[in-house]
From Swiss-Prot:
NCBIfam families named in the record: aroA (TIGR01356)
Gene field: aroA
The family this protein is said to belong to: Belongs to the EPSP synthase family.
Protein name: 3-phosphoshikimate 1-carboxyvinyltransferase
PANTHER family: AROM/DEHYDROQUINATE SYNTHASE, PENTAFUNCTIONAL AROM POLYPEPTIDE
Origin species: Brucella canis (strain ATCC 23365 / NCTC 10854 / RM-666)
Active-site residues, record numbering mapped to chain: D326 (proton acceptor)
Keyword list, A-Z: Amino-acid biosynthesis, Aromatic amino acid biosynthesis, Cytoplasm, Transferase
Enzyme Commission number(s): 2.5.1.19
GO cellular component, one term: cytoplasm
Amino acid sequence: MSHSACPKPATARHSQALTGEIRIPGDKSISHRSFMFGGLASGKTRITGLLEGEDVINTGRAMQAMGARIRKEGDVWIINGVGNGCLLQPEAPLDFGNAGTGARLTMGLVGTYDMKTSFIGDASLSKRPMGRVLNPLREMGVQVEAAEGDRMPLTLIGPRTANPIAYRVPMASAQVKSAVLLAGLNTPGVTTVIEPVMTRDHTEKMLQGFGADLTVETDKDGVRHIRIVGQGKLTGQTIDVPGDPSSTAFPLVAALLVEGSDVTIRNVLMNPTRTGLILTLQEMGADIEIIDPRLAGGEDVADLRVRASKLKGVVVPPERAPSMIDEYPVLAIAASFAEGETVMDGLDELRVKESDRLAAVARGLEANGVDCTEGEMSLTVRGRPGGKGLGGGTVATHLDHRIAMSFLVMGLASEKPVTVDDSTMIATSFPEFMGMMAGLGAKIAESGAE
């Protein structure tokens, strides 16, 4: 799916107070896994609150291509799964569009099957490195035919019987951890993942919920040992997907920056591996009230009331990066309006996202008058309270939905408008973004729609 074929620029202008109550679309990580585990489990899985962005739908299509039956009735997705170990060889390559999570997790899921599976994606996904997932699969006996640098398009040829491995994850990556655990589902014996730095743990929680024999132990040094016994039975479940914290970040930061704003965001996932942004903003002085914290489907959920706040710069501890890796672009926007300097470090993962996200953010900030310094793995932003003199630039989004949404948020509070060169790809993660922001009072218009 090529987004660049017909780009839709959009411009955000200085807005009056944002007010109202919103419910954020379902969490992307949990939505991908709901389709995957539901498609793999025996019996019926029912999902409400699913994020219906293109990325997640592509994961659903991949599961259908391997035998799962998926349909929608009203607001509920109903999946009849094939049963663990019973995926079918797809007749055509699996097309993941822009979905890095869907592609990498599915590589783990199918790699250990005695079959041939091909993966393709859009221009952006085809540039992203897949070796980090392919290397442990190779250790399990999977043969890989890939484009140069272990990139897509690629084909996996599974072994007759996979070898269980103990794999130490070399970087903080939930996708690598998850791919190995999913490969372990169809592997005899015990597959172990050793995780020195904890990352989002939806795969572990959800697999346990579906009945997998999976245990997690944390040693005295904080290193997690996750063990899964292969070839067990998974059983269909009922899932209500909580709101995505990474999508929540955009209206949340907008409400903090636009003077006089008071916005309530309902049903937000508050899993501790995902709340780094909220913690950081609170340290900067953000007025974020956490209302009715509760458990839903084994996950922490709460409502957030966010009021406009005067922010001050902070140093963000690098070890917090895994819990907010997708939120750094919008944190950089918040930092642009804060008093003093904000230092973000440990950002090497941002270099291999949908774009080189670190460079894209730095260029976008510079184009809009922000004083910032880009390091190899760091970004330092010196803010201008009230957004005085900020804006007036056009941002190259590089087909990256989070860059587009972050800079549209900037334009709502900066003195001059901010334009992004394309907004079509926002649909990959947050199709309702434009309408939801407009409902709160944000002035965002697609070019030509003035």
